[in-house]
Swiss-Prot record:
Region entry O-glycosylated at one site, spans: 168-176
GO molecular function annotation: copper ion binding; enzyme binding
One cellular component term from this protein's GO annotations in UniProt: extracellular exosome
Transmembrane segments: none
Free-text function comment from the UniProt entry: May form part of a complex of membrane proteins attached to acetylcholinesterase (AChE).
UniProt PTM: O-glycosylated.
Annotated protein name in UniProt: Protein CutA
SUPFAM superfamilies, sorted: GlnB-like
Signal peptide boundaries: 1-32
Gene that encodes it: CUTA
């Protein structure tokens, strides 16, 4: 090594371009350079996960996080899934149901490992309606133990979440819904 220079490290084209933007202050202001770094790199550099904006405050929409849920139900075939989907929408237990065909489920049942082709239903509803939705699905579903699980929606497109609430509003006032 002559002249006291550090050894050169060769980097791929994308990496060297990224580093040139990050380390050359004359090219970009500091905030812009930091935006170029992927969140993963920022997490690795800081040692802690990146902070998320508060769901209630990020759009100023007034949406209450968790007031809408996405429920998941598996069915043995598309015919059964469509019948249940139409019924829950007609009864206003859900605003929308997506049918995802040809999923494979592997599970233990009565001491045996089973593998079945099923249809997955993704049901959007108010969280307050999940118990009534569950009761209805259990009453019409052909499985001995129907899968009905729900996850709260923390964030999303406010007009869509508002629409889900509006479509299901009349049922949430009178929760008793029979098959």
């Amino acid at each position: 090594m002559s002249g006291g220079r550090a050894p050169a490290v060769l980097l791929g084209g994308v990496a060297s371009l990224l580093l040139s933007f990050v380390w050359m202050p004359a090219l970009l202001p500091v905030a812009s350079r930091l935006l170029l770094l992927p969140r993963v790199l920022l997490t690795m550099a800081s040692g802690s996960p990146p902070t998320q904006p508060s769901p209630a405050s990020d759009s100023g929409s007034g949406y209450v996080p968790g007031s809408v849920s996405a429920a998941f139900v598996t069915c043995p075939n598309e015919k059964v899934a469509k019948e249940i989907a139409r019924a829950v929408v007609e009864k206003r237990l859900a605003a929308c149901v997506n049918l995802i065909p040809q999923i494979t489920s592997i599970y233990e049942w009565k001491g045996k490992i089973e593998e079945d082709s099923e249809v997955l239903m993704m049901i959007k509803t108010q969280s307050s309606l999940v118990p009534a939705l569950t009761d209805f699905v259990r009453s019409v579903h052909p499985y001995e133990v129907a899968e009905v699980i729900a996850l709260p929606v923390e964030q999303g497109n406010f007009p869509y979440l508002q629409w889900v609430r509006q479509v299901t509003e009349s049922v949430s006032d009178s929760i008793t819904v029979l098959p």
